[in-house]
Amino acid sequence: MKLKNKLLLGGLTAVLLAVMSFSAWKIWAIRSEYHAGESAYEDISHMISLPQKTAEPQPPVINKPAGAETLPDEDDTVWPEVDFAALREINPDIVAWIYIEGTKINYPIVQGEDNSYYLKHLFSGEWNGSGCIFLDFRNDASFADRHSIIYGHHMKNGTMFTGIDRYKKQEFFDEHPVALLITPDKNYKVVFFAGYVATPQDDAWEIGFTEAEFEVWLQNAADRSCFTSEIAPIASDRILTLSTCSYEFDDARFVLAGVLR
C-alpha cells in the first residue's frame, strides 16, 4: 500500500511539474513575442518624428508631404514626418501610419492579400502573435473608399489597438477627439464620432453601401456610441473604423469610427 501511495504521489508530482514547466514556457514565449514586437517598432522609431512635448500639449502631428490637403485648423496641428521610402524598403505592404495622442498607438499600417496574415505577423512580415495594425484587404490603399477599416489586437501589454478601449469613457474622448492618419500622398485627421461594442454579426465591418444604406449605418453607429460627439457625418463623408477585441461577452469587438478630414 505504501509503495502504491508513493507511486501515486510520484506520478502526481511529475504531472504537476510538467504543467508548471509548460506554463512557465508559455509565459516565456508570450513575453518573448512581446519583446520582439516592441523591439521591431523601436528599430523603425527613427523613421517618424513626433512633435515635441510642450507645457500645453498640442494635438499630434506630422510635416505634410508635398501636395497634402490643407486642413482648416492646420495651424493647431503639428504633423509628424514619416519616411515611407525607408519603411517600404522593409515591407512594400506598408500603406500609412496612425497616431493617437494619449495612447501607445503610433504604428505603421500594412495591407495584405487577406485579413488573416497580419493577425500573426509584424509589419516587417516576421511571424509574431502580436500581429500588427492592418487595413482591410477589401479597401483601397489610398483610403478613398466610403468606409475603410483597420484592425489591431487588444494586447495585455497595452500595445496595438488596446488604447482605443479608452474611448469607452466620455472624458477620454473629450480630451482626444482626433487621430492622425498619414499616407504617402496626404494627411488626414480622423475626427471620431462613434465608438461602440459590436458582435461579429453586426454590420460594423460592411464595405459596400448604397448612399441610403450608408446614411442609416452612420446614424446607427452614432446612436450606439459610448460617447457623445458633436460630429454628424453625412453620406458623402469617408469613414475610417478602428477595430479590436473587447471582453464584454464572447467574441465582442470594440469599433471606433471617425470622419476623414
Question: What role is predicted for each listed range?
Answer:
Residues M20-R261:
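Solvent-exposed, non-transmembrane regions of membrane-associated and secreted proteins
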Residues M1-L16:
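N-terminal Sec-pathway targeting helices
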